[in-house]
Amino acid sequence: MNIDFSKIEETCTPNFKGGEKYYAARRYEDGLNRITMGRLVPGASIGLHTHEDSSEIMFFTGGSGYVVCDGERLPVSAGSVHYCPKGHSHTLVNDSPDTDLTFNAVVPVQ
């Protein structure tokens, strides 16, 4: 199965999980997995949250920023992969002054 994100409407969620600005995403969900093409504008963030019943894998495709996972700050940029296991907490921040932070994410229900 192929997912064509260009055919999925982008939605913008302000202050996602308590973050700054808004989170823009194109999402595919089938009840078992959520697969997302996401984008954070400069200065935007996804707030700190815990994956109670899922994990998350994020594949960064453009821009730069950082994640804080279980209190550890880690840089991310195109080519980086971030994994947040079930039961752990993380946040994502685009600290670039002028470039969107783009990524694909997979959240399997566990």
Identify the residue ranges that each predicted region occupies.
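A short, N-terminal "cap"/entry segment at the start of jelly-roll beta-barrel domains
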Residues: M1-N33, G47
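Conserved short histidine dyad/triad with adjacent acidic residue
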Residues: T36-H51
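A generic "binding-loop/recognition-motif" signal
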Residues: P42, D53, E72, H88-S89, ...
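Histidine-centered metal-chelating micro-motifs
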Residues: S45-G47, Y66, H82, K86-L92
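Glycine- and acidic-residue-biased ligand/ion/polar-headgroup-sensing regions
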Residues: D53-S55, F59-G65
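Short acidic-glycine-tyrosine-enriched beta hairpin
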Residues: E72-K86
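Ligand-binding loop in jelly-roll beta-barrel domains
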Residues: K86-Q110
